[in-house]
Design a protein with these regions (language model features):
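Short hydrophobic alpha-helices and adjacent helix-cap/hinge residues
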Residues: 1-163
Length: 163
């Protein structure tokens, strides 16, 4: 895979520049498609289907309603394009895989930050942090349908495998 598409809205446009840099470091070209309204979705999916080998999704509530998510998943499956979801639920519905947060661990991290503030630290002195724990969710049925093989070492560490 060399070209990875991503659908986004104005709500998540700030994520795209850093995602492009990260993708480039991995030898990938990120192909971002701005979706201004759900009416633009069919054209955006068709555009990506002809130019990328996979679609990555950002958790964007303006883009991913239950109806639009179904549409994207159905078209990705029909076109045999791997769709990388943003949650366990999207993988259960047909995305190839997702990295999802362990929300209990995120809550613990938030508590640690709150304790620092309560102990007198200025909020602007606390660095932004990423989640310490991520879960890998994988849909084996989707992998078979689109003829993609996920390395066994990844499958072995999956929190959930949907068969």
């Amino acid at each position: 895979m060399t070209r990875l598409g991503v659908l986004y809205t104005a709500n998540t446009s700030s994520l795209i520049p850093s995602a492009e840099k990260i993708a480039a470091r991995q030898g990938l070209t990120l192909v971002p498609i701005l979706v201004e309204s759900n009416k633009d979705l069919p054209k955006a999916i068709d555009s990506l289907a002809s130019t990328v080998q996979g679609i990555w999704s950002v958790a964007d509530p303006n883009l991913f309603s239950s109806k639009s998510t179904r549409y994207i998943l159905l078209n990705a499956l029909r076109k045999r394009i791997p769709f990388m979801g943003f949650s366990r639920n999207v993988v259960e519905s047909g995305a190839l895989f997702a990295l999802d947060f362990d929300y209990k661990a995120v809550g613990f991290q938030a508590g640690q930050i709150a304790n620092k503030i309560l102990a007198g630290a200025r909020p602007d002195s606390i660095n932004v942090t990423n989640a310490d724990v991520l879960w890998f969710h994988y849909n084996e049925n989707t992998a078979k349908h689109i003829d993609v093989t996920i390395p066994e070492e990844l499958v072995a560490v999956a929190k959930e495998v949907y068969r």
